[in-house]
Amino acid sequence: MRTSVLRQAGLCRAALAARHLQISSKPSAALLSQVTRAIAVQSLPSASLPRFYSAEATAQSNTAASNGLVTRFADLAALGVHENVVRAITHGMGYENMTEVQSMTISPALKGKDIVAQAKTGTGKTLGFLVPVIQKIITQDPDLAHRFGGKRARSDDIRAIIISPTRELAEQIGEEARKLVKGTGIIVQTAVGGTQKNAMLYKTRQQGCHILVGTPGRLNDLLSDSHSGIDAPRLSTLVLDEADRMLEVGFNEELRQIINYLPDRKVLPRQTLLYSATIPKDVVGLARSYIDKNNFEFVQTVKADEVLTHDRIPQYIVPCKGFENIYPAMLELIEKALNESRTNPEALPFKAIVFLPTTAEVIMANAIFKRLQWKFKHIPKTWDIHSKLTQNARTRAADEFKNARTGILFSSDVTARGMDFPNVSHVIQTHIPPNREQYIHRLGRTGRANKPGQGWLIVPDIELHAARSRLPGLPIKRNDELECASVNAADSGADKHANFQHILDAASRLPEDLFKDCYSSYLGGALQGIDRQALVYALNDLAKFGWGLEEPPAVRQSIMKHMGRVQGLRVETREHSMRPMGSGPGHRRDFNSRGPRRQSDDPFENALHRAQDLDRRPTRRQQASF
């Protein structure tokens, strides 16, 4: 199989003779360093290769790239890609020009090389790995190039597995893959948590499967179940998408177990394509386990002179008097943005993603603003996405928001990476993010395809110091223009902004358990770096002045033990049978190398250093100036 792909790639080498970045398969740390430097520094003309890729618009190219890289999808036929696949891209999906990551990865992947690619989300990575995956299957079984050709597909003869960190991203990849194989006999199935396993197995056994897209947990479950009927004895390609994210959320063990269920690559060679937005040490370790170090190419599309989204998009931080000021200030911001979109013809329609630190807070925010929408018709429709929803509900919400012209999506971090929501005008984050990287990934949901956007961070005063320490080196400006942010809600004589009463009215109709869940979720570690006693006092003020409760919600004994000796908590008289929702992720430390670097014989280590050279991350001692 592998030989046939290499032979096919060899037939088109004449068409690639002008390619300056041709890489020998001979392993050499020095050679890899030289090539990655060339890839990182040598910029392609912006007119030829658009920086961003999205489903709603594909940038047009007027001239061929000067360095000889294939930049048009129609030219894939010259590389041996089957005409049915090319037609699906150019006619079915309407794409003409490749993005940079597509141009730089498809060609070497078609030659059979393993790929380690550092590329940002929203740059067309999905199509970049789907094309070689599909073509390799067709090369292995030419009858599958046609819709009704070949033998009936089976569930125990999977040829490619694509692993994604989230259900939403896996579903998105599966949807794109089905568009690509529409004119072929290749069958695509998805396997994600939050859906009925038996229903997926029944469908897969009935239809068969050539490409299986899934999340690590569900894939490990299926492959480890000897009665599932899911197997991949002739697996030819393995794809790891958003590798850094999979490791961040703790899927390392599942990934290791999945590999144990796959054929030994020493007996049955397979191609591995690994994509990651960042290349920290744990990703390098992952690559070392999965990638053939004698036959791989490291592609880096993040350049030293590139203006990144978090450097380009205007960003503002709004310090608030207390937790109870956050929703009124957010409502004020939304109303101002709506007015701007109505009066400024050049402004995007208001379409916002609001990131909140816990699942319970996502549910509460959506419930409150949904009631505000019923009362004030100018407030756009709202949705929420979080881990407590079924996969069908999450997919429905994502699709509706994606297709909406205007709206507000309240979300936990399940949508922070990978999901492509077009024309998002605002990303609003409440409370301090778990780390600088997550702040940047959330912000990346706006400003896509070089469109305008804004980032807003709304934090109470007790989190301001932690925000300064956690978010250095970012162009975040302090904004004190929102009136609701500075109001002292505890002052009964104060002339409060009307938004405070609007929020109280909406909260008065919410169920008691929702307040208890939200209150407890903040005590579960969602806000690291905040003094526990100050946090309890702040939450009690929120309960009284923001939710209108006479006393704070009672908490379980286990939370009391976790909090230690703090004042102001009420304890439940008996253990509640239902656990609070969404305790939220804790702060994760970063393990960046320190001290002078030395040249290594390990090509993966050199790739790491080259990638980290472009990450202009400030030192830990620096603080933001807002």
UniProtKB/Swiss-Prot annotation:
Cellular compartment(s): Mitochondrion matrix
Region: RNA-binding, residue numbers: 578-626
Motif (Q motif) on chain: 74-103
GO cellular-component term (any): mitochondrion
Binding residues annotated for ATP, in chain numbering: A119, K120, T121, G122, T123, G124, K125, T126
UniProt-listed Enzyme Commission number(s): 3.6.4.13
Top EC class of this enzyme: hydrolase
Keyword line: ATP-binding, Chaperone, Helicase, Hydrolase, Mitochondrion, mRNA processing, mRNA splicing, Nucleotide-binding, RNA-binding
Motif DEAD box per record, residues: 241-244
Principal subcellular localization: mitochondrion
Alphabetical list of InterPro entries matching this protein: DEAD/DEAH_box_helicase_dom (IPR011545), Helicase_ATP-bd (IPR014001), Helicase_C-like (IPR001650), P-loop_NTPase (IPR027417), RNA-helicase_DEAD-box_CS (IPR000629)
Cleavable signal peptide: none
Activity regulation field: Activated by exposed helices in a group I intron RNA.
Bias (Basic and acidic residues): 607-617
Residues covered by the Helicase C-terminal domain: 329-493
Function description: Acts as an RNA chaperone to resolve non-native structures formed during RNA folding to promote mitochondrial group I, but also group II, intron splicing. Functions predominantly by disrupting accessible RNA secondary structure and depends on spontaneous openings in tightly packed RNAs to gain access to RNA helices.
Family stated for the protein in its record: Belongs to the DEAD box helicase family.
Protein name: ATP-dependent RNA helicase cyt-19, mitochondrial
Organism: Neurospora crassa (strain ATCC 24698 / 74-OR23-1A / CBS 708.71 / DSM 1257 / FGSC 987)
Name of the encoding gene: cyt-19
